[in-house]
Regions:
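A cross-family phosphate/adenosyl-ligand binding-site feature
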Residues: 1-207
Length: 207
């Protein structure tokens, strides 16, 4: 079934892959592209010349964050940087894309792309958990990263993102960390679980 999709691009070196995703999406769907100013630095001039890439309020009349939030069936942030995820989780609206996200009340897909150390940082993980009630996180994968590194943080491939959009997966709940069972008002049985295994399971399920 054809969809109206708003593709959001942020300032990651992996943003060049968004051009391939746009090509896949545009074959049978209506697609509009919003980008942050940083995102523009990582997509080709050819792509920008062939497509309308909206990044500034000055490019559109009226209230585009309202109009496009109501127009789109889905918003896909591909790729999403640590900075963008953190701003979104904290309700910041300092650009057109973030303002539109905060207006949107349907399914949002976010594909993180960053170094493993950033992705596993407690603050980033907390932001992802906070957003997970309303956002479907897609990836990242383990693989090649910037400056020749390898790790968990590689953006999922365009075809994977496309398949997720059109072959929706079921939701699951993963619990982790220490548990407590009260014996009476004073005594309790607990454990020293770190929650690392549960987090690893959750990350694998998100990918």
């Amino acid at each position: 079934m054809s969809k109206k999709i708003l593709l959001g691009i942020t300032g990651s070196i992996a943003a060049s892959k968004s051009e391939n995703l746009h090509s896949l999406l545009s074959k049978n769907n209506e697609t509009v592209v919003f980008s942050t100013d940083e995102g523009l630095k990582y997509i080709s001039e050819e792509f920008q010349n062939k497509n309308d890439i909206f990044h500034s309020w000055d490019q559109l009349d009226g209230s585009p964050h309202i109009e496009y939030a109501r127009w789109a069936d889905n918003i896909v942030i591909y790729p999403a940087t640590a900075n963008f995820i953190s701003k979104y989780a904290n309700g910041l609206a300092d650009n057109l894309l973030l303002s539109t996200l905060l207006m949107f009340d349907k399914e949002i897909y976010v594909a993180p792309a960053m170094h493993e150390e950033m992705f596993m940082d407690n603050k980033i993980q907390s932001n992802i958990i906070d957003l997970s009630d309303n956002v479907i996180f897609c990836g990242p994968r383990y693989g090649n990263l910037d400056i020749g590194d390898k790790g968990l943080g590689r953006l999922i491939e365009p075809i994977e993102m496309f398949d997720i959009l059109f072959n929706k997966k079921e939701k699951v709940i993963v619990t982790s960390g220490p548990t407590s069972e009260y014996l009476d008002d004073v005594r309790t049985i607990t454990n020293k679980s770190s929650g690392k295994q549960g987090r690893a399971v959750a990350i694998e399920l998100m990918s």
